[in-house]
UniProtKB/Swiss-Prot annotation:
This is Large ribosomal subunit protein uL2. It comes from the Bacteria. Residues 28-55, 207-277 are annotated as: Disordered. One of the primary rRNA binding proteins. Required for association of the 30S and 50S subunits to form the 70S ribosome, for tRNA binding and peptide bond formation. It has been suggested to have peptidyltransferase activity; this is somewhat controversial. Makes several contacts with the 16S rRNA in the 70S ribosome. It comes from Microcystis aeruginosa (strain NIES-843 / IAM M-2473). Pfam families: Ribosomal_L2, Ribosomal_L2_C. One of its GO terms (cellular component) is large ribosomal subunit. Part of the 50S ribosomal subunit. Forms a bridge to the 30S subunit in the 70S ribosome. The gene is rplB. One of its GO terms (biological process) is translation. GO terms for molecular function: rRNA binding; structural constituent of ribosome; transferase activity. The keyword Nucleotide-binding does not apply. Belongs to the universal ribosomal protein uL2 family.
């Protein structure tokens, strides 16, 4: 993937830097691997806003991604690299030898015509899925399972990768993109390589309209609201917060407040917590 910039002919193109989509080889998704995604617009079943700053945007078809990689020891050929509007990574369309088609997250370096396979004895090549116990130390991996058979839950964003740093007993130690180090069961599967489209972090949408097209609504600062609307609101001019620290719109402490449940059982598997900030 490359980043495309524009001549500054308009305010919207002056700051814009978007993907050139050159790695995309197929424009229409595989119909059998999609279903309609009803946009909730940030509302619950009663129509009450439960997630702010959501609404509008273009309609999307959801692509059914194979995070489990449970089709074991059957080779598959990469038929296409496609765009997915539901994530910043690209997806790869696989044609299995038995005729089945599936989508996976496209790792960096995987191209059309390559062959991938999942299984305990799969070779150590990009796109192949193996148990963590079979992956050499120092290997970059993504789409990592937390529970055997549940499917990959971690390291799925564009450019992301984790590293296998140690093996001991029934657990393998992984360093995550957040620098958190945690232990995972050795039977859990992971995919070799890092997620593709790493340049996604360099994208600059350039104008508000592109953000609205993604289904994101404006994020209004609390300090410019009235006191009835936000704890930061009110005052004359650019007034300070007037509280001991930043607050959420509902009056709870924000910024730096730890939200993880202290009694969560998996906390024992975290060797080092992620870096804050």
């Amino acid at each position: 993937m490359g980043i495309r910039s524009f001549r500054p002919l308009t305010p919207g193109t002056r700051q814009a830097a978007i993907s050139d989509f050159k790695e995309i080889t197929k424009t229409e998704p595989e119909k059998s691997l999609t279903h309609h995604k009803h946009s909730k617009q940030g509302r619950n079943n009663r129509g009450v806003v439960t997630s702010r700053h959501r609404g509008g945007g273009h309609k999307r078809l959801y692509r059914i991604i194979d995070f489990r990689r449970d089709k074991r020891d059957i080779p598959a050929k990469v038929a296409a690299i496609e765009y997915d509007p539901n994530r910043n990574a690209r997806i790869a369309l696989l044609f299995y030898k038995d005729g089945e088609k599936r989508y996976i997250i496209a790792p960096a370096g995987l191209g059309v015509g390559d062959t991938v396979i999942a299984g305990e004895n799969a070779p150590f090549e990009v796109g192949n899925a193996l148990p963590l116990s079979r992956i050499p130390l120092g290997t970059e991996v993504h789409n990592i399972e937390l529970v055997p058979g549940r499917g990959g839950q971690m390291v799925r964003a564009a450019g992301g990768f984790a590293q296998v740093v140690a093996k001991e007993g029934d657990y393998v130690t992984i360093r995550l993109p957040s620098k958190e180090v945690r232990m995972i069961r050795r039977e859990c599967y992971a995919t070799i390589g890092k997620v593709g489209n790493a340049e996604a972090r360099n994208i600059s949408l350039g104008k508000a309209g592109r953000t609205r097209h993604r289904g994101q609504r404006p994020h209004v600062r609390g300090s410019v609201m009235n006191p009835v609307d936000h704890p930061h609101g009110g005052g004359e001019g650019r007034a300070p917060i007037g509280r001991s620290g930043p607050m959420t719109p509902w009056g709870k402490p924000a910024l730096g407040r730890k939200t993880r449940n202290k009694k969560k059982r998996s906390s024992d598997l975290i060797v080092r917590r992620r870096t804050q900030g």
